[in-house]
Amino acid sequence: QAKLDVVILEVGLGGRLDATNIVDNDMAVITSIDIDHTDFLGSTRDQIGFEKAGIFRANKLVIIGEPNIPQSMLAHAETLGCQLFCRHLDWHFCQQEQSWTWQTTRKDEKVRWNLLADLPLCQIPLANAATALAAVQKLPFEISLETVKKSLLEVELTGRFQTMKPASLTHLAQMVQREVEALPRMIIDVGHNPHAARYLAEKLTALKAKSQGKVIAVCGILKDKDAIGVLTPLLPLVDEWCCVTLGGYRGQHGEDLFVTLQQVATQQHLSVQGSYLDS
């Protein structure tokens, strides 16, 4: 009805049975594959890969940013005759200290740019940015390099390593600069699987290399999530854990999370609070 030039649909869960899959797409994009939502998608990467491959369409483009592609996904793409454009096989990226580079691995690849150097670092996982850039390379209309670089500088994802100001500090504007700088940095991240936890650990590692002080984690996890898998990458980086209760029927009680943490966090201080507001 709106006669849009481009429609981007984000799959909510899996792909094959997701509501967004009623739309026939011209291009399917897979960012990553990890163990999550096992009650619905299966307990192995091969099962989950097949479910995600459900968004593929016959003879259409498929962009894959996952470096370790499950065989089930490749087999489904072959059955449908999809045009694959995959990380490592067809393109790759490399991060430098202040920038990054995107490049095709085959000189005969039909893309807009075979090599993009000195790209600005961005606030989202670089693998995701590189996958999005791979999709841009295959779009049937022009996008300028200036637009690409501007977008990389401006892109952000709410709730992913997001720095927050304490809501109670309504007088922040009246505070002198040294008082503001003395406030603890508050970072929120809604990652809920091991893959997201590993990315958070990378960000915390980089932050701790530049800053001094303790890392206090206020943590709540749903009952159906892999708590050990999420917590383990963060253990070397967190000094204190505060376990909180999440609401809803899937919410895990802080006391239960505390017991789980005791199994793996043997060196850190642990505590329990009723909610994140209490903490």
Residue ranges and their predicted role:
Residues 5-9, 19-29, 33-37, 47, ...:
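Nucleotide phosphate-binding/pyrophosphate-handling subdomain across enzymes
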Residues 33-36, 89-91, 220-222, 245-250:
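Short, acidic/turn-prone active-site loops that include or flank metal/cofactor-
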Residues 49-57:
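Membrane-proximal helix-turn-helix segments that form the acceptor-binding/catalytic region
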Residues 63, 67-72, 78-81, 85, ...:
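C-terminal helical cap/extension that packs against the catalytic core
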Residues 45, 72-73:
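Short regulatory helix/loop adjacent to the ATP-binding pocket of P-loop NTPases
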Residues 2-40, 74-114:
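Extended acidic/charged loop-beta regions that coordinate divalent cations
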Residues 56-64:
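Short loop-to-beta-strand entry elements in the cores of soluble alpha/beta enzymes
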Residues 42-50:
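Nucleotide-sugar donor phosphate/pyrophosphate-binding loop at the beta->alpha transition
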